[in-house]
Amino acid sequence: MKPICVVLSGAGISAESGIPTYRAEDGLWAGHKIEDVCTPEALQRNRKQVLAFYNERRRNCAEAKPNAAHKVLVELERSYNVQIITQNVEDLHERAGSTNVLHLHGELTKARSSFDPDYIVPCMGDQSVNDKDPNGHPMRPHIVFFGESVPVLEPAIDLVSQADIVLVIGTSLQVYPANGLVNEAPKNAQIYLIDPNPNTGFNPVTGW
C-alpha cells in the first residue's frame, strides 16, 4: 500500500501559471472590495457585478496552463497515494493530471443553484443573470463566499487525519479552514512547508 501524501495547496502554487495571488499588489482583489464581489450579500445586492468578477477570473484561469509544481505532484502519484486539498478555485491540478483533488473554496468551472446547493453543473463560459436552475431559481458561481460554510470541510479533515506526509505548498495558512487542517495530521506524520516566504511560526516537522 502506498503511503498517503496529503497536499495543502494555495494561490502561490499557481502564481507561475500567471494567476495572481490574493494579496499581491496586482492580485485578485486589486480594484475590488471583498464585500462587493465575494459575499452572499453582494450577490443579493448586485448579482451582475459579482458574476462579471467571476466571469473575468474564469476566462483568465482558462488561459493559464499548469506549471512544473502542478506536474511534480502528478509524478508523486507513482510512489504515493496523493490527495490534494486546495484553496484554489481553478482547475490547474486537474489539467496537470492529478487524480484526487478536493476544492475547499469551490470551483470556477462549475455553477450551482442559489436555492439548491446540490444542483451543480459545469460552467466553462460566462454566467449571466438570466441563468436559472430547472425550477427557475438563479444560478451562482460554485464558490464558497466569505461568511459561508465550507461543505467539504469534513472530508478534508478525514484526509489529513490519515496522512503519512503533509505537503503545504503556496499558502500562508492564514485563511480558514486551511489554517487548522494541518493540525489534524497524525502525530507521526511528516509535515513540510514549501513557501518562499514561510510562516516563521510553523515548524515543518511537528506543525504549529
From Swiss-Prot:
PROSITE patterns: SIRTUIN
Database matches in Pfam families: SIR2 (PF02146)
Residues binding substrate: 54, 57
Enzyme Commission number(s): 2.3.1.286
A molecular-function term among this protein's GO annotations: protein-succinyllysine desuccinylase activity
Domain of life: Bacteria
Main location: cytoplasm
Domain Deacetylase sirtuin-type: 1-208
InterPro entries named among the record's database cross-references: DHS-like_NAD/FAD-binding_dom, NAD-dep_sirtuin_deacylases, Sirtuin, Sirtuin_cat_small_dom_sf, Sirtuin_class_III, Ssirtuin_cat_dom
Keyword NAD tagged: yes
Gene3D superfamilies: SIR2/SIRT2 'Small Domain, TPP-binding domain
Localization, UniProt: Cytoplasm
Disulfide bonds: none
Binding site for NAD(+): 10-29, 87-90, 170-172, 197-199
Substrates-to-products reaction catalysed: N(6)-acetyl-L-lysyl-[protein] + NAD(+) + H2O = 2''-O-acetyl-ADP-D-ribose + nicotinamide + L-lysyl-[protein]; N(6)-succinyl-L-lysyl-[protein] + NAD(+) + H2O = 2''-O-succinyl-ADP-D-ribose + nicotinamide + L-lysyl-[protein]
GO CC annotations on file: cytoplasm
Keyword tags: Cytoplasm, NAD, Transferase
Active site: 105 (proton acceptor)
Function (record text): NAD-dependent lysine deacetylase and desuccinylase that specifically removes acetyl and succinyl groups on target proteins. Modulates the activities of several proteins which are inactive in their acylated form.
Comment, domains: 2 residues (Tyr-54 and Arg-57) present in a large hydrophobic pocket are probably involved in substrate specificity. They are important for desuccinylation activity, but dispensable for deacetylation activity.
Similarity field: Belongs to the sirtuin family. Class III subfamily.
Full protein name: NAD-dependent protein deacylase
Organism: Aggregatibacter actinomycetemcomitans
